Regions:
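Structural signature of nuclease core domains in nucleic-acid processing machines
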Residues: 1-216
Length: 216
């Protein structure tokens, strides 16, 4: 999701921006050269961004139980039902999908009390949250933010937020730092929206095949 008017005049009552990819806009870390290109998705035809979008579309519309049983068959269904084009389907390496569905993270999702996918939220934040975003040039007024979390699930002792990432990275620390601000805001604002405590914010890296906890 792209920024929407991130540098509104400070005299305005409020500004509005999207949280997704906040780290890239703020410039928290220097990205490795070509880091935005998910190398394992590279195939002739689609751009790297389109291939990453195809992976997210799979994760958005697939049946989790069906994908866990047979990721390739579920890909065929998504193409047959026109959630994905043939070109998009060809860009997805289902071994990456299988790694996710064989992970301890998926076992937690499968056993959760409740699961939300593509959870969209809108919130107004004030000085407390804005204080941590001073370098983003957002000013000091009330700011409306919008975002979407790929997956949220509820366990007995709280809410867990999961964001899927296709970035090409070489270490967990690089990915964790890149999305630290984004996930921190997700943790605070989604907990407020649901009225339940958020206990963990997690990234799942398809490039690394790992779950990465992000403190918030």
């Amino acid at each position: 999701m792209d920024w929407q008017n991130p540098w509104q005049d400070a005299t305005e009552l409020s500004s509005k921006f999207a949280i997704s990819h906040l780290a890239e806009e703020v410039g928290e870390v220097e990205k490795p050269r070509f880091a935005a290109r998910p190398a394992y998705l590279y195939k002739q035809g689609l751009t790297p961004a389109e291939k990453g979008s195809a992976m997210h579309t799979y994760m958005q519309f697939c049946s989790y139980p069906a994908a866990a049983r047979d990721a390739d068959a579920e890909l065929e269904r998504l193409m047959a039902d026109r959630f994905l084009t043939e070109e998009q389907g060809a860009a997805i390496e289902t071994d990456r999908i299988r790694t996710f569905f064989e992970s301890p993270l998926y076992r937690r999702i499968a056993g959760a009390r409740q699961v939300w996918r593509e959870y969209r939220f809108l919130a107004v934040i004030g000085e407390e949250e804005l204080a941590g975003l001073a370098d983003a040039g957002l000013g000091e007024n009330r700011t409306t933010v919008q975002g979407v979390a790929d997956c949220i699930f509820e366990e007995e002792d709280g809410i867990v937020i999961v964001d899927y990432k296709t970035d090409r990275v070489f270490s967990e620390d690089a990915l964790r730092e890149r999305y630290r601000v984004q996930l921190g805001l997700y943790g605070r604002l989604i907990g407020r929206a649901l009225g339940r405590p958020v206990k963990e914010c997690l990234l799942y890296s398809f490039a690394l095949g790992r779950t990465i906890e992000v403190p918030f």
